[in-house]
Design a protein with these regions (language model features):
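N-terminal metal-binding scaffold of metallo-dependent hydrolase/deaminase domains
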Residues: 1-37
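Divalent metal-coordination and catalytic microenvironments
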Residues: 7, 21, 26, 47, ...
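Divalent metal-dependent hydrolysis catalytic cores, especially in the metallo-beta-lactamase
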Residues: 60, 76-105, 120-133, 160-172, ...
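Active-site mouth loops of central-metabolism enzymes
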Residues: 61-73, 139-146, 189-193
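Charged helix-capping and loop-helix junction motifs
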Residues: 71-74, 105-108, 149-151, 226-228
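Conserved phosphate-binding/catalytic loop of the ribokinase/pfkB sugar-kinase fold
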Residues: 133-158
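Active-site core of metal-dependent hydrolases
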Residues: 158-228
């Protein structure tokens, strides 16, 4: 048994002070007053806060590395860096780029997911684009924006569809409904973003299965008194 000893532990209903966390085979068995148990492995945290790790669902890069490098080495360095800041898993997030660059990035993520052992775990890919509205492209490259369609999605991800966990898409572009329904039916979270959609169109998107918003208030139209 492993014991994380003497921590300030956050649970859903509040904080427990001077507490020990008992672990077996990577799972929490119990949280008890400090000193109640000894383990084969003891990690003394001496009054530090102990919380569940963060899951980052939108990260393009860090530590001088970028998901679009298309490099396993870059992803490994990212994973080590974010682990030091409390993130235990993340979705490697692409930008709206060329087919070749996107495929190279997906290939690298696929490779690291098979063998990764250090740092935060990469649990899949978040595709930010290319199915977005050019009016709200933000930092995305307009020349690589594509109409939403199952064919374009299939061409973009190729054999790596299985690692795509999340995609940012504008509900107000051609083909958005059909592609959204396909993605949701295949277990991929569809998030509204980079959109000039009206309130009514956003409600339609929710009805199709869109369930999140990407960097809310950024890359979208401003609120107006007659167009909320």
């Amino acid at each position: 048994m492993k014991v994380i000893k003497g921590g300030i532990v956050y649970q859903g209903d509040g904080w427990r002070y001077n507490a020990d966390i008992l672990l077996e085979n990577g799972k929490i068995l119990d949280i008890v007053p400090s000193g109640s148990y000894e383990g084969e492995q003891v990690v003394n945290v001496d009054g530090c806060y102990v919380c569940p790790g963060f899951i980052d669902i939108h990260i393009h890069g860090c530590a001088g590395r970028d998901v679009m490098d298309g490099s396993v080495e870059s992803l490994e360095e990212m994973a080590k860096f974010v682990a030091g800041h409390g993130t235990t898993s993340f979705l490697a997030t692409t930008t709206t780029s060329s087919l070749e660059a996107t495929r190279n990035s997906l290939k690298a993520v696929n490779e690291i997911m098979k063998k990764q052992s250090q740092g935060a775990q990469i649990i899949g890919v978040h595709l930010e684009g290319p199915f977005i509205n050019s009016r709200a492209k933000g930092a995305q490259a307009e020349k690589y924006i594509l109409p939403a369609s199952r064919d374009n999605f299939a061409e973009l991800v190729g054999e790596y569809e299985g690692i795509v966990r999340r995609i940012t898409m504008a509900p107000d572009i051609e083909g958005a409904q059909e592609l959204t329904e396909y993605l949701v039916n295949n277990g991929i979270v569809v998030s509204m973003g980079h959109t000039a959609a009206s309130y009514e169109k956003c409600i339609e998107g929710i009805e199709w299965g869109m369930s999140h918003a990407t960097h809310f208030y950024n890359a979208m139209t401003p609120l107006k008194h007659r167009e909320p």
